Amino acid sequence: MTNLNEGGNIWPDETEDFDQAIIGDMMKQVNSVLVKTGAKALPIGSGATPTPGKRSGDLDMIIDAGKLINFFKVKDAKGARVELEQLFQQAGFDTKKTGTSVHVKTKVGGEAQQVDIMVVDNGETASKFHVHDLPKGSPYKGIHKQIMLADLAKEKGFKWSPYKGLVNRDTNELVSNDLENIAKQLIGPNATAGDLGSVESILAKMPSAKEIVDRQEADPNSAWNKKKIQTQENEIVNALRRI
């Protein structure tokens, strides 16, 4: 499965963890620069459903590569990322590029924050695959849901792409990018898009999927467990910073 965490902390000595209450202001700064392109950066992960009082190290966003390619008159997403970075630089923002992302430093409340903008095909559709409905206090994050979807897709003879949707395992052709249909394909005929919101909601609709969780939990070297450990460590570090 595609690695969803490309940037890490780009400016460790310059940006700060931030209260999710300011995400709206951060997004306004980003999208004010993008207005002329006709493309809009959309929040994903926890940024799509911010919780005031909860802190984040960065804001992840997705933007449609096709719209940028058309606006900048370049041949591919790589060229679009180059132009996108220059656009933000011209607007006075500090930037960096890594992988598929352009990183932008916003400034709200006198402090700097990191925004990671992933430039991907069909960005508006892809962003829906990264919006989660995690229960309060859940030990699982969005990445765990993505891993679970990938395992469910494999069991059904498909592949899961966090940017395209459900694809044919043999031909890589798109099977569906509609979450309602994907839920029915992976869970059952009575499933809905809402059942794909979290690990817990998948298990509630499909108890047999507990086998996937058990298998992942049993492997100490799995991405599933490594992400849980990393998340716990980050929460401890963030708590210490606030003391």
Task: Identify the meaning behind each predicted range.
Residues T100-I243:
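Catalytic cores of NTP-dependent nucleotidyl/adenyl transfer enzymes across multiple folds
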Residues M1, D58, E83-L87:
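NAD-dependent ADP-ribosyltransferases
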Residues G66-K97, V104-T106:
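A broadly used, surface-exposed interaction patch
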Residues K36-I44, V82-T100, W160-P162:
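Short secondary-structure junctions
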Residues M27-V74:
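Active-site nucleotide-donor binding segment shared across nucleotidyl transfer reactions
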Residues T15-F18, F72-K75, H130-S138:
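Short histidine-centered catalytic/ligand-binding loop motif
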Residues T2-I44:
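Helical scaffold of the NTase/Pol beta-like nucleotidyltransferase catalytic core
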Residues D19-K28, V74-L87, G142-Q146:
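Well-ordered, non-membrane alpha-helical segments in soluble/globular domains
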